[in-house]
């Protein structure tokens, strides 16, 4: 939508000729502008997007042009379908941006055109009422146009005002009736009051529910119109045109409120040329999430849905996580020969972390659909998504059923299906499947020139879990040779996997040969990384096996005092302050130059109520500041002193 608006703004600023050529698009822009201005909840959501400033600047730039645009439209006598198409397109782009999966309410394209017929007296199919109204009375035109635009802007997120309810409407109708009964009024005054009364309905949240009630507002308005027809000599066509417009609005308000019975009843009272078509009725059932009524309607009416409609059905069922209905629809689509888009499966399972109920059934139905025609790479992506969910939930039986349909490992390497190969490596780690492990082990080296980085780490994790030392070292050497200059995080990952998955003798030998290439540049930060993974023992194992000189290790911690402080804080929290103190003693950390580390230990020791740790902190302070014990009231660590006195 923003691209469309940007295109309009650039063209409008560059040449005035564009305004003549592209009035429909310009009108669409101004209509879209009005849509967002009047719907505060929607504009709030839209303006939170990254490009909100761009849209706001466009709104400001053309805020004064909407009147000019409407004036241009009045003089625009070309095909209204072009205008309708542009308006519909930009409106639906708004909906798509706000509801990426399932727009609950969309004004159907037929409604756009029907409403425009009532606002454009230059149309060849023009009716007598609009021509009479718009050719003579500008005030009435504004009222009706305002009402029409409010219908065009309907959306489920719009929190419509409830300040004008049925009592106010009834009072307005009574005024209207008394005015018409006074024979002194003319046609213009009568129509103006009627239209202003109708305009109040847009504020009434119970509009559709009170419509068919006896002596409800519609019947009062209808009675009023009949009275006006007699007293002001309005012809029957004018009255029928007005009644048709009113029924159109009732129908779509009912649909907006999810009241299908009222919607269909109002629709049945409309002329066949304006009433919903069979396909539009199917759209209504979909919009109301009435899946079984939708299926029944399609079968009874023998409808062949468009590709766009099929897309909407799939997105609706996927976003609702309705696996049972989705399976039925997939099989139904296959039997009818309707196309199925794989992208919906991929996008849905990538965006939803929790697996849907009966997902194996959905996958089986999916395989049933694509058994004769599918893209192997796309199929692997979908299989990877399903398999990863099954692994997450430890559903081994479902994994085995899915693996029956997976291509051979060698073919997956040839097709570069690393999304699925990554998940298969994880499957081996979780379920210790020796057969799949052997197939991956036999094939990866033949295709290692194309292997991505994330798959290398999956291989390393798999080799470590299966205790395949030589395979692990081969993959590690290949990765080091390929990357040459490893970043810090890659060094941490490789060291941790190496210490976890390979026996100490081979690790020590590997460090002796290639250790300098994977050595962490920041040793305290590496310790923090290991602690984050709950693998502190492997960090200590690294110091023992790496062959680093003790003086070098001490210098690393001295030169990275901030990271050392962070490490001591994590150690105190996870392992206790006594462990942190022992660690400081091992590395001979110079507390003389940095009492922030003591602060960290003191803080956690107080929370632990650990007097041994508090005493150690006090002893260190005594050593750092001689004479501190003689002046405890001015101590650097007052909390520590209080706890020791207790």
Swiss-Prot record:
Signal peptide: none
Location in the cell: Mitochondrion
Disruption phenotype: Decreases mitochondrial respiratory chain complex III assembly. Decreases RNA level of cytochrome b cob1 and may lead to abnormal folding of cob1 protein. Abolishes growth on the non-fermentable carbon source galactose.
Top-level division of the source organism's lineage: Eukaryota
Keyword Mitochondrion: yes
Keywords for the protein's UniProt record, in alphabetical order: Mitochondrion, Translation regulation
GO molecular-function terms, A-Z: translation activator activity; translation regulator activity
Transmembrane segments: none
GO cellular component, one term: mitochondrion
GO biological process, one term: mitochondrial translational initiation
Subunit structure: Component of a complex, at least composed of cbp7 and cbp8.
Role summary: Translation factor for cob1/cytochrome b; plays a role in cob1 mRNA stabilization and required for correct folding of the protein.
Protein name: Cytochrome b translation regulator cbp8
Organism this protein belongs to: Schizosaccharomyces pombe (strain 972 / ATCC 24843) (Fission yeast)
């Amino acid at each position: 939508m923003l691209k469309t608006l940007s295109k309009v703004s650039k063209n409008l600023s560059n040449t005035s000729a564009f305004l003549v050529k592209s009035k429909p698009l310009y009108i669409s822009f101004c209509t879209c502008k009005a849509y967002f201005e009047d719907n505060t909840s929607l504009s709030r959501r839209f303006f939170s997007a990254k490009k909100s400033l761009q849209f706001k600047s466009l709104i400001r730039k053309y805020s004064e042009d909407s009147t000019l645009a409407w004036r241009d439209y009045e003089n625009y006598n070309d095909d209204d379908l072009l205008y309708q198409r542009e308006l519909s397109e930009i409106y639906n782009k708004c909906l798509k941006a706000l509801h990426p999966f399932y727009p609950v309410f969309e004004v159907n394209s037929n409604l756009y055109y029907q409403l425009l017929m009532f606002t454009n007296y230059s149309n060849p199919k023009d009716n007598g009422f609009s021509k009479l109204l718009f050719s003579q009375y500008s005030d009435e035109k504004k009222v009706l146009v305002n009402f029409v635009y409010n219908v065009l802007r309907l959306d489920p997120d719009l929190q419509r005002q409830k300040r004008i309810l049925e009592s106010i409407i009834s009072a307005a109708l009574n005024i209207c009736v008394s005015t018409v009964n006074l024979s002194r009024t003319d046609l213009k005054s009568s129509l103006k009051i009627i239209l202003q009364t109708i305009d109040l309905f847009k504020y009434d949240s119970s509009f559709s529910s009170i419509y068919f009630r006896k002596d409800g507002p519609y019947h009062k308005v209808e009675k009023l119109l009949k009275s006006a027809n007699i007293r002001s000599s309005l012809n029957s066509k004018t009255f029928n045109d007005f009644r048709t417009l009113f029924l159109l609005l009732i129908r779509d308000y009912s649909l907006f409120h999810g009241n299908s019975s009222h919607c269909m009843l109002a629709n049945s009272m409309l002329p066949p040329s304006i009433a919903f078509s069979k396909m539009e009725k199917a759209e209504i059932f979909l919009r109301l999430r009435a899946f079984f009524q939708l299926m029944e309607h399609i079968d009874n009416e023998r409808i062949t849905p468009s590709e766009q409609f099929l897309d909407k059905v799939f997105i609706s069922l996927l976003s609702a996580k309705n696996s049972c209905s989705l399976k039925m629809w997939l099989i139904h689509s296959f039997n009818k020969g309707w196309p199925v888009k794989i992208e919906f499966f991929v996008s849905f399972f990538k965006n939803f972390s929790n697996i849907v109920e009966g997902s194996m059934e959905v996958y089986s139905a999916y395989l049933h659909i694509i058994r004769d025609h599918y893209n192997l790479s796309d199929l692997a992506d979908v299989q990877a998504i399903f398999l990863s969910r099954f692994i997450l939930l430890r559903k081994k039986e479902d994994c085995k059923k899915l693996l029956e349909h997976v291509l051979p490992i060698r073919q997956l390497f040839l097709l570069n299906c690393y999304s699925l190969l990554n998940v298969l490596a994880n499957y081996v780690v979780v379920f210790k499947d020796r057969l799949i492990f052997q197939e991956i082990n036999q094939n990866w080296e033949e295709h290692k020139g194309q292997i991505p980085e994330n798959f290398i780490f999956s291989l390393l994790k798999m080799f470590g879990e299966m205790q395949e030392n030589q395979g692990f070292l081969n993959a590690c050497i290949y990765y080091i040779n390929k990357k040459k200059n490893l970043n810090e995080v890659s060094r941490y990952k490789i060291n941790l996997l190496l210490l976890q998955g390979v026996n100490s003798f081979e690790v020590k030998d590997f460090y002796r040969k290639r250790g300098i290439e994977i050595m962490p540049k920041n040793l305290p930060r590496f310790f923090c990384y290991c602690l984050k993974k709950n693998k502190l023992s492997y960090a200590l194992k690294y110091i023992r096996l790496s062959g680093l000189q003790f003086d070098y290790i001490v210098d690393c911690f001295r030169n990275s005092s901030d990271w050392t402080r962070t490490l001591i804080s994590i150690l105190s929290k996870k392992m206790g302050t006594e462990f942190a103190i022992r660690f400081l003693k091992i590395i001979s950390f110079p507390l003389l130059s940095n009492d922030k580390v003591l602060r960290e230990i003191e803080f956690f020791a107080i929370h632990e109520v650990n007097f041994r740790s508090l005493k150690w902190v006090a002893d260190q302070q005594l050593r750092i500041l001689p004479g501190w014990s003689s002046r405890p009231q001015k101590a650097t660590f007052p909390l520590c002193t209080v706890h020791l006195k207790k």
